Structure formats: structure tokens, C-alpha cells
Amino acid sequence: RGAFEELLEVKNKCAYAQELDSTGAVLAKVAATPGAIGYVSLDVVDKTVAALKLDGVDATEDNIKAGKYTLSRPFVMATKGSVSSQSELVQTWFNFVKSDAGKKVIKGVGLILPE
């Protein structure tokens, strides 16, 4: 919710009719309730709901990558200090995420790879 409020600049301005604790619950509620609005990741939007156009721009992977669809945020991985100063396990994880196999996993779970 924090990212939604921050990106739309509506923090402390929303009166939520109902707060749900899972993506599936949000999709089901929005699909069943005329006029409902919910927020979920792009990869789970299905034909039961419609993704919001923002300033006339469709919510697509290409538009997100191009910076045209601004209602998105990156996932980040962080360490205390440089990756090269971390344990071998942590370094192995970062190397995997950047590898072709890691990118395949990222795409497989519906996330958008950075350019």
C-alpha cells in the first residue's frame, strides 16, 4: 500500500473501504465489486479485472521498461557494503540473479527484468 500511496501522491488521503491481505483476495473483490479499485502486480492481472491506464498509457511490460507507465516500482536487493565484501553464499546469490538462469526464474515468476 505504501508504494501505491507514494506513487499516486495520495498518502493520508485515501479512505479504504476494505483492506485485504492477499493478492487473490484483492483480485476476487475487485472482479466482484463494480467500481472497486485494488492494487496488485502486473503479472497477476487476468481477464477478470482491467489494469488501470495512467495518463492514457497501458500497463504493459514494454511501457514500464520505457518509463511510460509510472505506477510501478523496482524490487531491490541490498547488502551492508559491496557485494564483493559479502560471504561466498551472498556473492553466489547475486551472481545467480544476474545469470541467464536467474533471469529465467525472475521472468518465470512474472517480474520484469531491468534493461
Question: Over which residues does each language-model region extend?
Answer:
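Exported/periplasmic ABC-transporter solute-binding proteins
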Residues: 1-115
